From Swiss-Prot:
Its main location: cytoplasm. The keyword Zinc applies. Binds 1 zinc ion per subunit. Its cofactor is Zn(2+). This is Ribonuclease P protein component 4. Transmembrane segments: none annotated. It is found in: Cytoplasm. GO terms for molecular function: ribonuclease P activity; zinc ion binding. Zn(2+) binds at C66, C69, C96, C99. It comes from Hyperthermus butylicus (strain DSM 5456 / JCM 9403 / PLM1-5). Consists of a catalytic RNA component and at least 4-5 protein subunits. The gene is rnp4. Keywords: Cytoplasm, Endonuclease, Hydrolase, Metal-binding, Nuclease, tRNA processing, Zinc.
Length: 115
């Protein structure tokens, strides 16, 4: 790949990521106003932009959107966040208040016995 072609691809990738972030933030604002359908459409548009550009899903889309109902997860509005300690593992448990789907993310996994 030539240098200018790689640069233009990188520039297009950066512009697409900015557009995806802007759409996600607009979806979060729509949820705070109570317009859930607009928020879903904005998230779908952000995901479509990501697919067209063949990008990995950014972390804020992986963790900030419900997999079941495609609604942005806003603490206290559409999501409940809890920390659960289970033996040697600490998990972040996010419950979508719109559909009830439960997301579990491992935060800390402590090792036993090794010093």
């Amino acid at each position: 790949m030539s240098g200018s072609k790689a640069k233009s691809r990188e520039l297009a990738r950066d512009v697409a990521l900015q557009a995806i972030r802007t759409l996600y933030l607009a979806a979060v604002d729509a949820v705070r106003r109570g317009d859930y359908e607009l928020a879903r459409r904005l998230v779908a548009e952000a995901d479509e932009t990501r697919r067209v550009m063949r990008l990995r899903k950014p972390r804020f889309l992986r963790r900030g959107v419900c997999r079941n109902c495609s609604l942005p997860l806003v603490p206290g509005v559409t999501a409940r966040y809890r920390l659960v300690r289970d033996g040697s593992v600490t998990r972040l448990v996010v419950t979508c208040l719109a559909c009830g789907y439960i997301h579990r993310h491992v935060l800390v996994q402590r090792r036993r016995g090794s010093r």
